[in-house]
Amino acid sequence: DLRMSRGLGDVYKRQIVYKGMFLVGQLRTFFRDLQDVDYESAIAMVHSRFSTNTNPSWERAHPNRFIVHNGEINTIRGNADKMLAREETMSSPMLQDELHKVLPVVNTQGSDSAMLDNTLEFLTMSGMDLPLAVMITIPEPWANNDTISQEKRDFYQYYATMMEPWDGPASILFSDGDVMGAVLDRNGLRPSRYYITNDGFLILSSEVGVLEVPEEKIVLKERLHPGKMLLVNTVQGLSLIHI
């Protein structure tokens, strides 16, 4: 079925995206390569919930190319309109007359998650590191925040001239295959909790108890704080950064 095949998933140099309109327990049965005992990955992002603001479809099913998302982006219409308006002034010395082939940046027929994913993909494919792109699109509250450094305040003020916040109650996980991170909206309206185990695993989820972990293996229990980012670099090992 052609319509279904467009939403089955994606394959990249460092990532494979599996998706479908079924329960988590059915995923391995549907995609048989997941049954192979030799199949290994340092990163796994799983999204399992029903759509709230859009009708369910293969194309809108999570994960997206870079993110999984629990929540809503309430500013999505303004965000999408701004991205489309920027296309009028876009230029590229590399693409030149072929720039039109990468436009539009956002697919306005997609979900709010998909349009944010479109934007992050555009920024990273333009040479920006994914964590930086996430900080620009989902900034912490900085304008009247006396607890952040002047350097970070200057960072947000600079990029605020180029990108408006994608705002709303949201917990977002992101990965490019090498780094994996999580960010919580500035108001902390979605839960995100994580464990670190003594055998080197980091487990983050919106609910406690998603995976059964013996208490004696847990070396750290923590939650993601509003507007903050958790980042792990798998190339450098389990380096945990709380930005």
Where do the language-model regions lie?
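Active-site-adjacent "gating/activation" loops or surface patches in catalytic cores
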Residues: 33-56
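Phosphate-interacting basic helix/loop segments used at nucleotide- and nucleic-acid interfaces
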Residues: 151-170
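C-terminal, non-catalytic interaction/recognition modules in large multi-subunit enzymes and RNPs
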Residues: 36, 167, 177-180, 184-199, ...
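Single conserved hydrophobic/aromatic residue that forms the stacking wall/gate
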Residues: 2-8, 12, 241-242
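Acidic loop->beta-strand submotif enriched in PP2C/PPM serine/threonine phosphatases
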Residues: 55-65, 215-222
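Short, flexible loop/turn elements at secondary-structure junctions
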Residues: 47-52, 72, 174-176, 208, ...
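Conserved catalytic micro-motifs used in adenylation/nucleotidyl-transfer and phosphoryl/amide-
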Residues: 44, 57-73, 77, 164-204
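Conserved catalytic alpha/beta cores of large enzymes that bind or transform nucleotide phosphates
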Residues: 74, 80-81, 88-152, 209-240
